Regions:
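Outer-membrane beta-barrel channel domains
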Residues: 1-136, 143, 147, 208-210, ...
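Exposed, low-structure sequence patches enriched in small/polar residues
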Residues: 31, 130-339
Length: 339
């Protein structure tokens, strides 16, 4: 049918599939994978369109946009105002995987059936500010909206989404965040990323505030231990209440996978990378330890009633990965292989 629920790569940073179908003529399953991107550069103005993933932030992982969810059609631009300021905007078309019964009825008969999903979209913009050679600040805002194919209000790039969302009825899902990069010196840098879901200004300093967060902290140093090497440590933490909205049509998901941090809400990950370069050969050591708690639709509804449980109270799953890889060029031009 197409919209097939599947758990492959559910607890892995590996990009998930949009769908998996059973083969009609043989045993097993099949899927489709396609990425395409067209960019046109007008000096300080870049237009992008296609079907691809983005990565916002300075870390290995991203709380905002990562390549975990299947790629999605989108159009956007980046405008470099001057040497210190840049502005980014995008509009993407997501898959909610929630059947639209009013339209699906037109795609069924005695021998065939197709499932049509209710439209879900995302609009996002980002300001990048290079304060000096030490600090770079980025400020993000996005909105998930659904049930209409396109909303003209969110196509106006310069408008802030938060007041617009309230203006048209408070039916959508707003996210905000920032990234900070601090270059300690030529060899070291540190970074912080912050993601906020469900912004309610008047409740900021209350214990029950409906302002729910995700955090990322990282540190990177070059030439550590060995010359031409790089060491990175990173910690990611997500509240059990982010990404999933009180109306599931507005979840921060595409094809049932989070657009941001790969493990989704109610999770944390500590990772280390150590990379050494030997000419055009690369040796990489990777360690990752992830913990993720239960997160159901019933729990989401309880969160909005301020009845949330303690973190990991109803159980959790853990994942530890240690890997060593070695990449080297082959005798065939532009071909590489790794073990």
């Amino acid at each position: 049918i197409g919209n097939v629920t599947q758990d492959i790569y559910n607890f892995s940073p590996q990009q998930s599939y949009a769908y998996i179908d059973q083969s009609k003529d043989a045993e097993g399953f099949w899927t489709e994978y396609i990425n395409t991107k067209l960019s046109y550069n007008f000096n300080n103005f870049i237009i992008e369109l296609g079907k691809f993933n983005r990565h916002w932030g300075n870390g290995v992982r991203s709380l905002y946009f990562s390549n975990k969810a299947p790629s999605y059609p989108q159009i956007g631009f980046k405008y470099k105002l001057n040497q210190k300021l840049s502005y980014l905007y995008l509009h993407g078309f997501l898959n909610s995987n929630i059947p639209d019964s009013s339209r699906s009825s037109y795609y069924k008969n005695d021998f065939s059936l197709r499932s049509i999903s209710i439209p879900r979209n995302i609009a996002a913009h980002r300001i990048e500010w290079k304060l000096n050679d030490k600090f770079i600040f980025s400020f993000n805002e996005s909105v998930i909206y659904a049930t209409r194919s396109l909303d003209i209000y969110y196509l106006i790039p310069i408008l802030p989404f938060y007041p617009i969302e309230n203006y048209i009825g408070d039916t959508d899902n707003i996210q905000m965040g920032f990234d900070i990069l601090f270059r300690i010196n030529e060899l070291q840098k540190a970074y912080v990323s912050f993601f906020m879901d469900e912004f309610t200004p008047e409740w900021i300093f209350k214990s029950k505030n409906h302002n729910w967060f995700g955090w990322q902290f990282g540190y990177n140093i070059k030439d550590a231990i060995l010359k031409n090497s790089e060491f990175q440590i990173e910690y990611n933490w997500t509240d059990q209440r982010i990404y999933m909205h009180k109306y599931d049509i507005n979840d921060f998901y595409n094809h049932q996978h989070p657009l941001g941090f790969w493990a989704g809400p109610h999770a944390q990950e500590l990772l280390y990378n150590y990379i050494t370069y030997f000419g055009d050969r690369i040796l990489k050591f990777h360690f990752s330890k992830t913990k993720r708690g239960l997160n159901t639709r019933e729990m989401v509804e309880d969160n909005y009633r301020d009845m949330q449980l303690k973190r990991y109270e109803q159980g959790y799953e853990e994942r530890t990965l240690v890997s060593i890889s070695f990449k080297t060029p082959s005798n065939i031009k532009d071909l590489r292989y790794s073990i």
